[in-house]
Amino acid sequence: MLQIGEDVDYLLIPREVRLAGGVWRVISKPATKEAEFRERLIQFLQEEGRTLEDVARIIEKSTPHPPQPRKRTKELRVRRVPQMVTPPLRLVVGTYDSSNGSDSELSDFDTSKVKGNRSSSGRTRKVRKMPVSYLGSKFLGSDVESEDDQELVEAFLRRGEKPSAPPPRRRVNLPVPMFENNLGPQPSKADRWREYVSQVSWGKLKQRVKGWAPRSGSEVGQTQQASTAAERAGEMRHSQASSDDDSSRNTGDRSDQMLGTRRWKPKIKWVSLRRCRKEQVPPFAQGTGMPAEEHPEAAENQGAEAAANQRAEPLASPRAEAAASPRAETAADPRVEAVASPRAEAAASPRAEAVADPRAEAAASPRAEAAASPRTEAAASLRAEAVASPRAEAAASPRAEAAADPRAEAAASPIAEAAANQKAELVDSPRAETAADPRAEAAASPRAEAVADPRVEAAASPIAEAAANQKAELVDSPRAETAADPRAEAAASPRAEAAADPRAEVAASPRAEAAASPRAEAEASPRAEAAASPKAEAEANLRVEAAAYLRAGVPPDQRAEAIDSQRAEGPANQRTGATENQRVEVLADQRAGVLHDQREEAGPQGIQEASAGSGSRAQKQVKTVRFQTPGRFSWFRMRRRVFWHTPRLPTLPRRVPRAGEARSLRVLRADIRADVEHREQEEQL
């Protein structure tokens, strides 16, 4: 029988207790339910065949010290006292915090608590000893009696008590929640995330997950999803524009999931990728491996997706135009025969006329090279991929077009941009040579050599560099060439550049608008974004190139396709497993040499970008070892023991083992060993 006070948790009271006479069942009562308790107690005693006298006697028996006054009478006396005068007796159910076990004597502290309750004044004037740790350091033991500590002590002693409240209602057995198995379709992780996100402000969310855009309705089916894919892609790119380059790291994997169909992506640790940028061809250039396996089904997937996306996106037209424009020649048939055989089509591709030789080699392994150089791939397995990837197809068309009029000089290779750049650099040199040479050299494996040295590669696939150089040269070089060239460059470039900077890709949407109002956009948007992000230099290209479109009078369809090419670029690249970040870091180096050439050129901007790159992930503070003094390990040298490895001779145990213990030598030996160990420990301490 327990009479429990207000703030005791019933759940802490044991249901049965081992006392004299066996196990007792504990009946607890809230102090106020006196009568009820009474009758329950009596009922219980009847069941057990005992009387209150028995109870008293048993309790007495179980207490060793001189018998207390009979419990029964005590209970009656308590009954007689008007209930609410004093807080009822409080049962302290084993609350003793061991945290201060060292400096508060249990006896002092806990017994005083109990005594306090017995005299039923929770707060006696007498200040009890209390764990000093509450009042500052143990060793500076602040003087507990001092007045200012008084409140502290009081507060500490009052710790448990809540302000006395209306008598507690009996705790009702709370219903155990039941879980039905027939729950409807559970929301996917994405849906749950989306739902959670809907409660976060959009700006906050963008900081948290950069580049992620929500699907508009969670339950609404795939159909709607397809339709929203376009806006989502747009939003995604916008949000990406505002956020810095980690954004691109995230969008990297997101964007292709966003774009409708979901396709297999190789799992790549970006760190390793960044490492291998330095010494060897990055995973997607590592030969036929990935893109090659992917092509067969990628063709259906992405073909579908290309259709879905591009139809959905504002750029539905470029796709049509892509068919209409120079690529029509290639697109009409190679698109078909690309499906049939990317290799066969190799001959048909726009690059075919110009390029028999890389063609041959590309035909030898269009895929290998496709993997090796997105540029060549763009031409080689491009048609294959034209089906496979929106990028290829969009790129195919700009490339076809790039080939269409720069064909004159650059058509020699869809590495038109290589030609473009060298044309820029060797403006005076014979077109023939420029065209033939980058074709040969770039086609050889622009990517491999690109990796060998982004600079060389900048020659091979220099678009961004071309963009960079031409940024200078465009301006003064003859308009004709500018027209041909940015066109080549723009057509080829948006893709290189899109790779070179996520901004371009972000600009995919601005650039989509650029198709609508290119000048305003080219100026306004990249400007804004240049402000928004360190990629300003890449921006400059963009701007140049967008302006170049205009100057060159590139018909909107090409522009659109350039755009399209890079709109599709996101997914296509991710297929290669590079996220924009890598695309920035790897492709920008490898494919475009941008981060070299432009960094020189953009000087402060380049630096700003580098710093922003590191700054965005805040530097982790490095912990240093506190005292690196020579004395740090002296304790180790001070060891007394001379022969480390000799066992210490067993000394006699300090106390003679009692007869019972000495029974077996083993006990004795164990004793000695324990002793020795103890001493060693002491020594070490």
From Swiss-Prot:
GO biological process per UniProt: microtubule cytoskeleton organization; regulation of mitotic nuclear division
Ranges of compositional bias, category Low complexity: 299-329, 337-353, 361-401, 409-420, 458-468, 505-519
Stretches the record annotates as Disordered: 93-127, 207-263, 281-538, 558-579, 599-623
Polar residues bias (residue ranges): 219-228, 611-622
Domain of life where this protein originates: Eukaryota
Modified residues (Phosphoserine): 142, 146
Tagged with keyword S-adenosyl-L-methionine: no
PxLPxI/L motif, short sequence motif: residues: 647-653
Main location: cytoplasm
Role played: Core component of the 3M complex, a complex required to regulate microtubule dynamics and genome integrity. It is unclear how the 3M complex regulates microtubules, it could act by controlling the level of a microtubule stabilizer. Required for localization of CUL7 to the centrosome.
General remark: Despite its name, does not contain a coiled coil domain.
Protein's name according to its UniProt entry: Coiled-coil domain-containing protein 8 homolog
Species this protein is from: Mus musculus
Source species taxonomy: Eukaryota, Metazoa, Chordata, Craniata, Vertebrata
